[in-house]
Amino acid sequence: MLRPSSSFRSRLRFARSLATAVPHTAEAASQIRTVGVVGAGQMGLGIGYVAARTAGVQVLLTDRSESQLSKGLAFADALLEKEVKKGKLSKDEALEVRGRLKVVKGIEQFGESGVDLAIEAVSESLPVKQQIFSALATHLPPSAILASNTSSISLSKLAASAISSTTGENRAQSVVGFHFFNPVPVMTLVELIPALQTHPSVVAQARAFAQQMGKTVTASRDSPGFISNRLLMPYINEACIVLETGVASREDIDATMKLGMRHPMGPLELADFIGLDTCLNIMKVLHAETGDSKYRPSVLLDRMVSAQYFGKKSGVGFYDYRPAPPPPPPAVARGAEGGGDAEAPAPYGDSNTA
């Protein structure tokens, strides 16, 4: 008679424990009335927007860059205007949503405003995130949930840094991973990742609130890359290696996966959309945490990030996203013959760079 292996049984116990420890309760979600978001970039603003628009809670946004906060609010205004034009919201409803989005100067104001759930959504840097979690543990009440939108960093490491600098109180049991996907208003998935220290009630509240935001929740252990990036990033990295070793052009790599595998985007186009710096950081985490050579970042990916070719957000990545310059006046064009300014750098994979 065949018996399941011990590793299979342990995985089954883990799945069952999540099912029992994470009830789908409206009561758990209703405990969250005010959300604080650290980071007003595309991810942070998207999280705040959906929390205010769909979950209907008060949202406080903070960012060390005032210009980023202004850009974030302008983006929210544009989203609301689009929803009104499409008839998804009335003007009054849009005003109500906008009224629930507020800017504060710093994390200390989260505590003053009674934040129930704080979500960190900054760059994938462990030291930066650790500083934020120490500040959250210092300024938020013991009942508040401290969540991270990290896409690869260990939640248990982040939880270990959630110690109040004033009282020494350890808040590790309040920390949970809350990985949203870009663009947050469109993508319906959230990965839920408990740290080793996370209390089951925190997981229950986080799951319930994600569902209140209209999201589908998948659960993962605190393992490098979780589910999504453990699968996605090696795929993107291998596409970079296929390009750098001359196996195929960028266009043929992307066309093969789009037309042959029915992927909506090719791996190199997707890398540009995510951000090549983000892809590289995640690959470095996977490689460092597992020690497995299959996660070693592509040399090409590393070089492109060093050259500050980050993809769409920088204007150049595997493809060129810069607007085409207008043609020069005839006199200028004639004068430029045999000289003139050097051409701007081309994306990797163009005929003059491949």
Language model features: what each stretch is:
Residues 2-33, 55-56, 201-204, 211-222, ...:
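NAD(P)-dependent Rossmann-like dehydrogenase/reductase catalytic/cofactor-binding core
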Residues 13-82, 139:
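NAD(P)+-binding Rossmann beta1-loop-alpha1 motif at the extreme N-terminus of oxidoreductases
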Residues 60, 102, 119, 176-178, ...:
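Hydrophobic/aromatic beta-strand patches that form the interior of the parallel beta-sheet core
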Residues 60, 215, 232-236:
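Structural/interface elements that position substrates and couple domains in central-metabolism enzymes
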Residues 64-70, 81-146, 153:
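Rossmann-like NAD(P)-binding element
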Residues 79, 188-189, 235-242, 266, ...:
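A general alpha-helix detector
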Residues 145-221, 229-230:
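Rossmann-fold dinucleotide-binding core
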